[in-house]
A protein has these predicted regions:
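Conserved N-terminal beta-strand and adjoining loop/helix that marks the start
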Residues: 1-25, 41
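Short, well-ordered beta-strand micro-motif
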Residues: 18, 89-93, 109-111
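Residue-level recognition of beta-strand microenvironments
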Residues: 21, 75-77
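Conserved Nudix-box catalytic region and its N-terminal flanking loop in Nudix hydrolases
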Residues: 24-60, 148-151
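A short coil-to-beta-strand element that immediately follows conserved catalytic motifs
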Residues: 66-74
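Active-site-adjacent beta-strand/loop module that shapes the phosphate/pyrophosphate-binding cleft
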Residues: 78-98, 127-131
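NUDIX/MutT-family hydrolases
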Residues: 100-132, 150-152
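Acidic/histidine-enriched, glycine/proline-rich intrinsically disordered or flexible terminal extensions
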Residues: 133-153
Length: 153
């Protein structure tokens, strides 16, 4: 193999499903030019951060909550131009603080049964499936002429 095939630009991301042990999950109605719809809190991993540090920081910035012991549920990745975006998906039911929305969008508790009925952001059906799996899962999303293909394994 050529080294070109082994080397690619990568952007690390994170997302966390937070549940309150009363049948509710925390939803974020994201408002943005590039990505909008109902999702979970999360964002970019900054240089020098661990993945867990980054998800704790992002959740705090977007919700005002401090999470503890996020559990890695899987990986969701997609190609955007010449960059592979790799999202680490976590879930937790341990948190403290007061819920505060940010400029990323409104955050609120919603029942687990109602969440999938929302106008979900792209890829969130697959993220939802990964978050509810008993084993870690991976999803690769590719965009083709026929549309978006999401391969879960």
């Amino acid at each position: 193999e050529t080294s070109e095939k082994r080397l690619e630009k990568v952007r690390f991301m994170n997302m966390c499903m937070i549940s309150d042990n009363k049948g509710n999950v925390l939803a974020l109605d994201k408002v943005g030019k590039n990505y909008s719809g109902t999702t979970f809190p999360g964002g970019h991993v900054e240089a020098g951060e661990t993945f867990i540090e980054s998800v704790i920081r992002e959740v705090f910035e977007e919700t005002g909550l401090t999470i503890k012991n996020p559990k890695l549920m899987g990986i969701y990745h997609w190609i955007s131009g010449d960059v592979r975006n790799v999202g680490f998906l976590y879930r937790t039911d341990e948190f403290e603080g007061k819920l505060i929305s940010s400029d990323e969008g409104r955050v609120y508790w919603i029942s687990e049964k109602d969440y999938p009925k929302k106008s979900l952001a792209p890829g969130m059906q697959q993220v939802w499936q990964i978050m509810h799996s008993d084993v870690p899962m991976e999803c690769l999303q590719t965009i083709t002429e026929e549309g978006i293909i999401a391969k879960i394994q």
